[in-house]
Amino acid sequence: MADAYLLDSCTIIAALRGEPAALLNRLVTIAPNRLHLSGIVLAELATGAEKSPDRARKRKALAELTDGMVPLPFAAMDAHAYGRIRAALERKGAVIGPLDLLIAAQAVARDLVLVSDNLREFRRVHGLRCENWMRGK
């Protein structure tokens, strides 16, 4: 079975900007039903749009890009994965940002590959598969 992917906010922001080519080329090769959006990522993106001086344009661009993508709600299985991951990271003294931790937990719980340009933080999470489509890694 082919991998399914969870797109991080930095990946979607780059796609909204129309760059880099490596990311855009990869996105068009993946079937839409294999691309997932976390409700947490959508909240981050909506916040960015609302803080923009050009809110209307940012809202429209975000809606167009995410049209057809059903945001994954944060469910009980995600919460349990979050608890395991956070406890493990705290034991190592290697905690990551709170929203990144929630997003990583969703990816782990649902066996999704997280697509992000922030691999340095995400690679601290045991069991998280992640890729960087912006740099071809």
Predicted regions and their residues:
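Generic structural signal for small/hydrophobic residues in well-ordered secondary structure
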Residues: D8-S9, L45, Y82, A107, ...
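Short, well-structured N-terminal submotif of metal-dependent ribonuclease cores
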Residues: M1-L37, A49-E64, G136-K137
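Nucleotide phosphate-binding site architecture
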Residues: I12-I13, A43-A46, L72, R123, ...
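Residue-level recognition of specific faces of alpha-helices
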Residues: R26, G39, A61, G68, ...
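Active-site neighborhoods of divalent-metal-dependent phosphate/nucleic-acid chemistry enzymes
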Residues: D3, M69-V115
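Alpha-helix capping/helix-boundary segments
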Residues: T11-I12, V41, D78, I103, ...
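Acidic, PIN/NYN-like endoribonuclease modules and their adjacent C-terminal/linker elements
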Residues: A2, A104, V108-K137
